[in-house]
Amino acid sequence: FPLAAVTGRAEIMDAPGPGGLGGTYGGSPIGVAAANAVLDVIEDENLCGRANQLGNRLKQRLESLREKAPQIVDIRGPGFMNAVEFNDRTTKLPSAEFANKVRLIALDKGLILLTCGVHGNVIRFLAPITIQDSVFGEALDILESAILEASAGN
């Protein structure tokens, strides 16, 4: 169901006259009801807390690999939207090659990862917060294996 919102500073939002700011999706009571139901689920199922819990598990697993995989130079992100950044072990420069190697090894093992960042040396994570714990555990195992395998060969 269609739903849209526009936000901005008061002086801008108050500038248009009556009827001057609107759109196709304005006034859809079914869309608003659906959005309210989604907000209820987020609260009732504590999905914000779950996002923090999953994000912490991911960050802890990545942190535990730093000693064996010195290419890991940064682990960051709020909640369950995280990223790990890799540099070359020798030059200490951003390493898109290493990030891509991790991605390809993980893909061979059944885990799809996305590289990104200005230098292409970052892998970001944005999985659904409703992921089953067993599936998430399997993903963490594959990720760890891929990073360690890439590090051993680099």
Briefly describe each language-model feature range.
Residues 1-154:
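Conserved N-terminal phosphate-binding loop of PLP-dependent enzymes in the Aspartate aminotransferase
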